[in-house]
Amino acid sequence: MAHKKSGGVAKNGRDSLPKYLGVKVGDGQFVKAGNILVRQRGTRFHPGKNVGMGRDFTLFALKDGRVKFEQKNNKKYVSVYEE
C-alpha cells in the first residue's frame, strides 16, 4: 500500500464581485424620470415625492426635476421636485 495521501485543499482564494451600491446623484442635481438615484441594501434612504422604489430597494425618479435629500422623523428621504 505505497499510496501517497492527497494534499489539502486551499480554502481561501475567492473574492466576491463589487455591488456598486450608494448614492448616484447629488443634492440639487437635475434628473430625468427613470434615473437611478440610490442603490442600497434595505431602506437606508426612503422614497419621497416623485421617487419610486424597486424590488431591490433601488430609488429612482418618477418625474423630471431636482433631487432633494431630506430628513424627517429620523429617516432620510430622497425627493424629486419639478421645476
From Swiss-Prot:
Keyword Secreted: no
Pfam families hit by this protein: Ribosomal_L27
UniProt KW keywords: Ribonucleoprotein, Ribosomal protein
InterPro entries for this protein: Ribosomal_bL27, Ribosomal_bL27_CS
GO biological process, one term: translation
A GO molecular function held by the record: structural constituent of ribosome
Highest taxon, organism lineage: Bacteria
CC annotations in GO: cytosolic large ribosomal subunit
Record bears the keyword Signal: no
Alphabetical list of NCBIfam families matching this protein: L27
HAMAP family documented for this protein: Ribosomal_bL27
Similarity section: Belongs to the bacterial ribosomal protein bL27 family.
UniProt cross-references to PANTHER family, sorted A to Z: LARGE RIBOSOMAL SUBUNIT PROTEIN BL27M, RIBOSOMAL PROTEIN L27
Record protein name field: Large ribosomal subunit protein bL27
Species for this entry: Thermotoga neapolitana (strain ATCC 49049 / DSM 4359 / NBRC 107923 / NS-E)
